[in-house]
Amino acid sequence: GGAGEVRDEPAGDECNGGACLAATIDRYCHVSARWLPPFFAHRSRIVWSKIELVKERSEIEHPAVRAALEMLGIEDGVEIHHDGDLPARSGIGSSSAFAVGLLHALHALKGEFVGPERLAEEATRLEQDLLNEPVGNQDQLTCAFGGLRLITWEPGGTWRADPVTLGPETVRALEERL
């Protein structure tokens, strides 16, 4: 990439190695999930920029929600709400933030604790393999781990997301320039 250019790093066997410095910002993607009681005419309610009331998982319009429910084997009715500080397709990782948040909420709903490594890998699989999005995996890694990270990829696709520690004065100087 050229000066000022940002590109997604390919994951898996396509990766020739590389590194990037990635930081999260103070904008959020709130995702909540609960089991929907069986008293409604619909089986699931998905609330995002629209409200979906569906009887079957296959009727869910939101592709990431439908794929995540299938990926995690969730058949029972659910209610999912998404509120984001940033619009979809903003170009700064909002879709990956949603994928990570959605998977985290669904695992919690199932009573499962899932760490950032697994969340990042599942979000990457969701976006790349199930939704066929032309993305790398640095956004998923950054969203799952948070903070300021040095992400490195080895040939073959293995990766690390190491925290970068800065002193208070450096943090202030960086924040003033962002």
PLM ranges: what are they?
Residues 26-126:
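Anion-binding (especially nucleotide phosphate/pyrophosphate-binding) glycine-rich loop
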